[in-house]
């Protein structure tokens, strides 16, 4: 995924045009970012994913290879590379629209077989930027391999019991946590009351 980020003092209202202060194109996707950082920290990282046959896809593969992320299991199905349109205001608050293209072309059975075939595997990390079926199969394989499983539930949607029961670490941000708990804000929230059940 590629991040297309515009910085502005004020987020435009519907029908309004405002001037931006800066525009940045960068590598994105929570899974890809975690893979890159892990590789830079010395971990042996394999990325299983899908990018387009466009210039964004070329750049992502080059970036993986440059930092030591193994990209041999990245497929290129002919779709456009997925993008995230990000707007950041003067307070650093962001608003993100994810347009999934190639990401959604991953085959869940292939993902399962790949995870089962990788030697010396210790962790499986994924998020909601791929399909629910891929997450199910990835975590199923991960637990069969006695791996730690980590789920980043963004963009947020309810989490089926089949996924939640195979998740060791759930790492939502503030907004996603509020959605899970059906609350509007963390102000005065008692975290001892947090409940994580299927279909949150």
Report each predicted region and the residues it spans.
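Residue-level marker for the onset of beta-strands and adjacent loop->beta junctions
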Residues: 34, 81-84
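Short, basic and Ser/Thr-rich N-terminal targeting/leader segments
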Residues: 41, 79-82
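Ribokinase/PfkB-type carbohydrate-kinase core domain
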Residues: 1, 63-79, 86-200
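Glycine-rich phosphate/adenosyl-contacting loop at the front of the ribokinase-like
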Residues: 1-50, 55-66
């Amino acid at each position: 995924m590629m991040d297309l980020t515009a910085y502005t003092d004020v987020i435009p209202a519907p029908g309004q045009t405002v001037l931006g202060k800066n525009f940045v194109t960068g590598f994105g996707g929570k899974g890809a970012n975690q893979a890159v950082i892990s590789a830079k920290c010395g971990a042996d990282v394999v990325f299983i994913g899908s990018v387009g046959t466009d210039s964004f896809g070329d750049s992502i593969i080059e970036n993986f290879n440059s930092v030591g992320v193994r990209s041999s299991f990245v497929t290129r199905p002919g779709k456009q590379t997925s993008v995230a349109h990000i707007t950041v205001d003067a307070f650093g608050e962001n608003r993100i629209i994810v347009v999934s293209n190639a990401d959604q072309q991953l085959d869940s059975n292939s993902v399962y077989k790949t995870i089962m075939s990788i030697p010396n595997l210790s962790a499986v990390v994924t998020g909601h930027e791929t399909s629910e079926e891929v997450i199910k199969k990835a975590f199923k394989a991960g637990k069969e391999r006695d791996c730690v499983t980590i789920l980043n539930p963004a963009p947020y949607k309810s989490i089926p019991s089949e996924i939640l029961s195979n998740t060791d670490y759930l790492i939502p941000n503030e907004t996603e946590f509020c959605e899970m708990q059906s609350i509007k804000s963390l102000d005065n929230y008692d975290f001892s009351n947090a409940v994580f059940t299927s279909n949150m």
